[in-house]
Curated annotation (Swiss-Prot):
Organism this protein belongs to: Corynebacterium glutamicum (strain ATCC 13032 / DSM 20300 / JCM 1318 / BCRC 11384 / CCUG 27702 / LMG 3730 / NBRC 12168 / NCIMB 10025 / NRRL B-2784 / 534)
Record flagged with keyword Transmembrane: yes
Protein known as: Alpha-(1->3)-arabinofuranosyltransferase
Biological or metabolic pathway of the protein: Cell wall biogenesis; cell wall polysaccharide biosynthesis
Record Pfam families: GT87
Keyword Membrane annotated: yes
E.C. code: 2.4.2.47
Assigned keywords, A-Z: Cell membrane, Cell wall biogenesis/degradation, Glycosyltransferase, Membrane, Transferase, Transmembrane, Transmembrane helix
Length: 418
């Protein structure tokens, strides 16, 4: 029996719309615009104690001025500049803006715009029209999450990375190998956590994407080695720090283990259990890579990145923005997010709620630090179980000659755009 059934030859469906779009857009667009304005002009402009932008901007200014870039004292708890020389070279144009406030506001605005554009692309990838109410509702809901709010408040690059991820998924689905490879290569250059996503073009045999995904960060770093002042210190000073598991502001499993003093054997056991669930879920999802390409690509991406957040040496709650493409599969006929357990998980890794309690201060503090850990772990479990159920069910369905094939499960409820 084939591990990956061949999709039937059908024409691309027309983007979907709902009969409620007129009312939905009238409600959702004003809310989305007002929430975006508040997040930008109030929350982001005011900023917070945690400030990712100043660290990056200062390093880029050192690059422009010819001062060694990697000169920080890593035993302080301040945000540190951790980008490799190639990423420094890529981001260098930001350092040529000499006005700090202007540079910061522009950077925040670009990230906010990138989030909006990413949601538009994910709306289309999910099969819905941009004129439907899906896009503005998604934007409005995203503005309520911790990941979007803190990305803007801390002024980091996650909004741009989300757009790059959405473009990469579009390229995988539409077989645009070279563009997809360039985009994912740049994403890997900035954040190596995207490296496991090269699995997607590998199994789809999109060799151009795989080649560029590897060569892009290699070439940038090779060139930057001769251009970035003190580039060698990235290897001698920064990389050893990156290999450490810090015991503060760290929601990963290793971070939890070091915080609570978990025995090494127990940490390794949990690591292997969750790593195995991620791997088996990815293998089970392979069956749908041709029949349901967006569902497969987004769900595989989601479980791989969640595995990275949960199992790596550093996991921070706002990384959860990269799970948004997986959440968009809710709009399709098959999704992990059709299961209520996935939404319990989403609450823990997306909610901006704070946990304070005078009666249970320790429990409240643990929830502040590790709510994302709970959410990521739960999402891995529910994805693993769902993928196995789908895999077994699909094998049985394909083995039944009389089983009907439904080509449009939503035709009773939806209208098509002209």
């Amino acid at each position: 029996m084939s591990f990956s059934p061949v999709a039937p030859s059908i024409s691309a469906p027309t983007p979907r719309r709902s009969r409620w779009d007129s009312i939905g857009n009238a409600v959702a667009w004003p809310l989305a615009m007002l929430l975006m304005a508040h997040r930008f002009f109030v929350l982001a402009i005011n900023g917070a104690v945690t400030d990712d932008f100043t660290t990056v901007y200062s390093a880029l200014r050192r690059f422009v001025e010819g001062i060694p870039v990697y000169n920080e004292v890593y035993h302080f708890v301040d945000p540190h500049y951790l980008y490799n020389p190639g990423a420094t070279l890529l981001l260098a144009p930001l350092g040529y803006i000499t006005h700090f406030t202007l540079a910061r506001w522009m950077f925040i605005a670009v990230n906010l715009l990138a989030i909006v554009l990413a949601f538009g692309l994910l709306t289309r990838l999910s099969g819905w029209a941009l004129r439907s109410m899906v896009w503005p509702i998604a934007i409005a809901l995203a503005m309520l999450t911790e990941t979007v709010q803190n990305t803007l408040i801390f002024s980091n690059i996650n909004g741009i990375l989300l757009l790059m991820l959405a473009i990469f998924l579009w390229c995988v689905v539409h077989k645009k190998s070279w563009l997809g490879g360039l985009v994912i290569g740049l994403a890997i250059l900035i954040k190596p956590m995207f490296l496991p996503l090269l699995f997607l073009p590998l199994v789809k045999k999109q060799w151009g994407s795989l080649i560029l995904g590897i060569l892009t960060p290699v070439i940038f770093n090779a060139v930057a080695w001769f251009l970035v002042p003190g580039a060698s210190e990235y290897v001698t000073r920064t990389m050893p720090y990156l290999g450490e598991t810090r015991d503060f502001a760290n929601s990963s499993l290793p971070g939890l283990a070091i915080y609570f003093g978990m025995p090494t054997w127990m940490e390794i056991t949990w690591f292997l259990i969750f790593g195995a669930m991620v791997g088996l879920a990815v293998l089970a999802l392979l069956r749908f890579r041709n029949t349901e390409p967006y569902f497969w690509a987004a769900t595989t991406t989601g479980v791989l990145l969640t595995g990275v957040f949960f199992l790596s040496s550093l996991g921070q709650m706002y990384y959860s923005m990269m799970i948004f493409p997986m959440i968009f599969t809710l709009l399709g006929s098959r999704s992990v997010f059709h299961n209520w357990v996935a939404w319990v998980a989403a609450y823990f890794f997306l909610s901006p709620d704070t946990f304070t309690s005078q009666r249970l201060p320790d429990v409240a503090r643990w929830m502040e630090f590790f709510s994302a850990t709970v959410g990521w772990g739960l999402l891995i479990v529910v994805t693993f179980v769902s993928a196995l159920i789908w895999f077994i069910g699909d094998i049985r369905a394909k083995g039944t000659p009389s089983s009907p094939i439904t080509t449009d499960p939503t035709h009773d409820h939806l209208e098509r755009t002209a």
